[in-house]
């Protein structure tokens, strides 16, 4: 009897090894054939928050913690520190910057709003009401004297006169936020501070619409795809996309690299088909088919930072912001002749 069972056990063990190896092969992603991201040396080690450019694609501004303010005039290849005399005893953390032409805005915490009309040659402080719900969290320049600002508890305001007056867009705030994203047509999605639920808002609605998260995993970040769908990143490296125009219907969740234990922090589209996914410990993934399959950019995995934010100013100009003053700049790979 033992003589019969011994070969059978060997076959079972061999089959298990084959399955394990197959699982490992699927668990670790293939490397990309090229690396378009270059590390930019910056004169700071502060955590970076946001980047924006004027109507001149070579002239931009970078903001971050402890009043970090950097300017570039060569398309982001080099950056120079700029200081502002704000006259306060404490230090601000700048969290958002946006330009429309030569007119720009910077928000920060504790509550501060800065405005420029000369591409940043001079910055003026815009007074904010003490009754403002929360502190400025993000701002988007919409045009001449026009901008839309959100606070860290989801109050949305718009100005049409350069910040002299502000109109409330929602009647009630949503609560303390972890992350918030805005679509090009003015829709918002916000993740609660603990990642337990998310809320959406569209122009014309009086209040935010709450939604339960799609699984037991807490939400990390959410945003809009280029075709109008929502995407979400959940704890444990999980990614999920919604159905078009239905924020309650979702495709199956998946882990692009389920052998990894780190989480994702941001996702951004360079083109409708090319999607970049950033996470902790220098992890950077890319999909060239709209999120169906993924590859890993292993050339940057030794960068000693978490990648917090991916931003494409245009398909040809992109940046990844991280901790410790880490900035990656996208350089499009020359096409073969």
Question: Where are the predicted features?
Answer:
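Residue-level hotspots at or immediately adjacent to binding/recognition sites across diverse folds
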Residues: 22-337
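Bacterial N-terminal signal peptides that target proteins for export
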Residues: 2-12
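Bacterial N-terminal signal peptides
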Residues: 11-22
């Amino acid at each position: 009897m033992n003589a019969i069972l011994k070969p059978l056990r060997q076959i079972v063990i061999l089959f298990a090894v084959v399955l394990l190896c197959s699982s490992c092969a699927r668990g670790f992603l293939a490397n990309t054939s090229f690396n378009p991201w270059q590390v930019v040396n910056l004169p700071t080690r502060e955590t970076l928050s946001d980047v924006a450019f004027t109507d001149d694609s070579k002239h931009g501004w970078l903001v971050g913690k402890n009043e970090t303010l950097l300017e570039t005039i060569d398309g982001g290849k080099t950056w120079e520190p700029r200081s502002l005399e704000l006259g306060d005893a404490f230090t601000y953390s700048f969290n958002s910057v946006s330009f429309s032409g030569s007119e720009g805005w910077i928000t920060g915490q504790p509550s501060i709003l800065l405005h420029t009309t000369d591409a940043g040659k001079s910055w003026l402080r815009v007074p904010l009401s003490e009754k403002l719900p929360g502190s400025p969290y993000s701002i988007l320049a919409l045009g001449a004297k026009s901008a839309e600002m959100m606070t860290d508890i989801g109050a949305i305001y718009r100005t049409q006169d350069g910040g002299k007056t502000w109109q409330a867009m929602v009647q009630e705030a949503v609560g303390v936020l972890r992350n918030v994203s805005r679509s090009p047509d003015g829709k918002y999605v916000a993740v609660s501070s603990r990642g337990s639920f998310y809320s959406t808002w569209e122009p014309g609605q009086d209040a935010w619409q709450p939604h339960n998260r799609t699984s037991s995993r807490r939400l990390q970040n959410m945003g809009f795809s280029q075709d109008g769908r929502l995407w979400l990143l959940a704890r444990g490296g999980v990614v999920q996309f919604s159905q078009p125009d239905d924020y309650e219907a979702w495709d199956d969740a998946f882990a692009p690299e389920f052998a990894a234990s780190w989480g994702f922090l941001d996702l951004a589209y360079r083109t409708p088909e090319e999607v970049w996914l950033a996470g902790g410990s220098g992890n950077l993934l890319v999909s060239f088919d709209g999120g169906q399959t993924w590859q890993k950019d292993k050339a940057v995995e030794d960068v000693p930072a978490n990648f917090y934010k991916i931003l494409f100013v245009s398909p040809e100009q992109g940046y990844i912001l991280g901790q410790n003053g880490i900035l990656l700049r996208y350089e499009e790979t020359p096409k073969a002749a």
